[in-house]
Amino acid sequence: MVEYKFKWKNDGRTKVMIGCGTRPEIIRLAAVIKRCREYFDCCVVYYNQNWDRNLSTVFWEDFELKNTFGEFGPDILVPVVGENLGVTCGNILGRSFELLSELQPDGYLVLGDTNSCLSAISAKRLHIPLFHMEAGNRCKDECLPEETNRRIVDVISDVNLCYSEFARKYLADTGLPKERTYMTGSPMAEVLRMNLDKIQKSDVLERLGLEKDKYILLSAHREENIDSEKNFLSLFTAINALAEKYDMSILYSCHPRSKNRLVKSGFKLDPRVRVNEPLGFNDYNKLQMNALAIVSDSGTLPEESSFYLSIGHPIAAVCIRTSTERPEALEAGDFILAGITTKELLNATDMAIEMKQKGVLGKPCPDYVDETVSMKVVRIIQGYVNVVNKMVWRKDQ
C-alpha cells in the first residue's frame, strides 16, 4: 500500500497527475511542472528509481520545485526498486494503479522512456486521459531498453507530444492518430533559460580546481555502455587513450551504478580521469560551458549543445553512442556521434574541438530552442482531457 498525505485542492481546476522516476525526467519536466502547478490542481508522483541524493533530491532543489506542502520534492514518493528489473517494473505498475485508482486525476502526464513511464499502462486501463511527452523518439537500436518502453507508451497514449517532425512523422507512419499527435519541441531550452543565471554563477570550477578549456567533461551511464562487457572495455579503454592524448583532467560525473561497475571490473582508469560524484544541474552545465570538450552518452547533450549555440556559446559535444533518437540535431550539426572505440572517440573529439576553435559550427535546431513548450503542453492537456473522455472512452460529459 502506498502511503501519502496528498489531497486535491478541489478548486474546480483540471486535476493533472505527473508521473516521473529519474533525474532526466525531473530536469525535462521542471518548467512543465511549474506551469502545471500554476494552472492545474496538480500532483507530482515520483517513482523512486534513483535512490542516490545526487540523482534525485538535489534536482528538486536546483529547480526550486516545491510540493503542495511547501517542501522541495514531489507530492507523493513511491518506492519501487526491487531485487531485479521484473520486481521493479511490477512495483511501478501495481503502485501506480493503486494511486491512480484512489486519486482519479482528470489527466496523467509522463515524459520519455524510463521504466517509470510504464505507469502509463495503469492510466490506460483506468480510462484516464494519457499524455506522453517526448513521443516518437526512436534510435532503431533494440539493445536499448528505452526503445521498448518508447513503443509501449507511444501506442497506448491518448495524446502524443513530439519534440520534432522526425518523431511526428514516425508516429504517423506507424498508424497512430494524427489528430492526437502534436509537435511541441523539446522542453530543455526553457529549463536551461530558467536556470541560466544560476548556471553562470556556479563556483564549481573553483571548488574542483579546474580552469576553462583545461579539462574534458565525461558522463557515461547508459546500460548499453556499462552493462555490456565488450562495450564497457571498449569505451573506457578509449577514455584512457583520450586522457593520454590530451594530457589533462577528464572529470567523470559518475553514477553509482557506473562506479560499482568500475570497482567490480577492476578496470584501471588513467590517473587523469577524476571520478566525481554525480553533479547537480547548475554545476554540470557550468562545467559544460567551460570544458574543452564534452564526452557523454546523455540524451540531453544534443539539446544542450543546440541551446548553447543559440546563445552564442558553442560547446564541443561528442556523443559516445552508436545510435541516436535525435536525428534533427545531427542534421543541424549540433553534435558528433562518436561511437565507443578508441579510434572513433579520438577522431570525433579532435574534430569537435578543432571546429569549435575555428568557428566551424552547426546551427541551433529549431525544435530545441523553443522556450514556450510548457505553455503549449498545458494548453493541449486542458483542451484534450474532455476530447479524450468523449471520443476515446465515450464518457458522459
Task: Describe the residue ranges of each PLM region.
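Nucleotide-activated sugar donor-binding and catalytic core shared by glycosyltransferases
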Residues: 1-248, 258-397
